[in-house]
């Protein structure tokens, strides 16, 4: 290879590697906007992006703007397949700048479950906001439901995963 081509290649790689940390730092430092509507979810604990005190609060519009997924599955509570839609749990944690390896998911009634963040990454778990195209009311597992893709991964049909499938979610604490 000619020396000037090699120097250009090495120089380009060096500039790219120097720019990446600054872009990452800018992304991590990006402010989280304050919610305009009623707060559906509060994330606290080991997070770096906040919008109210030391918490990240999300309204419906903010949650709908995050990367999302549709899961068609039955659940231990819904024997027939349903279409669930909502933001990826991992995307919610990323938006809050979560640093931890575990989360405590808390429901409106005080029920809580510890969930390893690796579950969110491995199974593309969502915080379901809609079932069959309709927002989920509190009386029907809403407003948010930690949903695993049960039908796609039969190994998820266990007592441990059922316990992690919290519904009526309103808070997540990151550890």
Please name every model-derived segment.
Residues 1-4:
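Positively charged n-region of N-terminal signal peptides that target proteins for export
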Residues 24-175:
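N-terminal intrinsically disordered, low-complexity segments enriched in P/E/S/T
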């Amino acid at each position: 290879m000619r020396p000037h081509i090699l120097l250009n290649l090495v120089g380009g790689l060096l500039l790219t590697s120097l720019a990446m940390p600054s872009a990452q730092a800018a992304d991590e430092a990006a402010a989280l906007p304050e919610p305009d509507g009623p707060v559906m979810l509060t994330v606290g604990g080991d997070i770096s992006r906040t919008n109210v005190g030391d918490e990240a609060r999300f309204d419906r519009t903010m949650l709908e703007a995050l990367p999302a997924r549709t899961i068609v599955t039955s659940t231990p509570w819904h024997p027939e397949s349903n279409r669930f839609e909502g933001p990826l749990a991992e995307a919610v944690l990323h938006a809050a700048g979560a640093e931890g390896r575990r989360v405590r998911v808390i429901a409106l009634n005080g029920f809580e479950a510890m969930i390893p963040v690796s579950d969110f990454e491995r199974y593309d778990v969502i915080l379901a906001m809609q079932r069959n195209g309709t927002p989920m009311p509190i009386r029907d597992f809403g407003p948010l439901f930690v949903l695993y893709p049960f039908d796609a991964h039969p190994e998820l049909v266990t007592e441990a995963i059922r316990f992690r499938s919290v519904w009526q979610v309103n808070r997540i604490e990151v550890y």
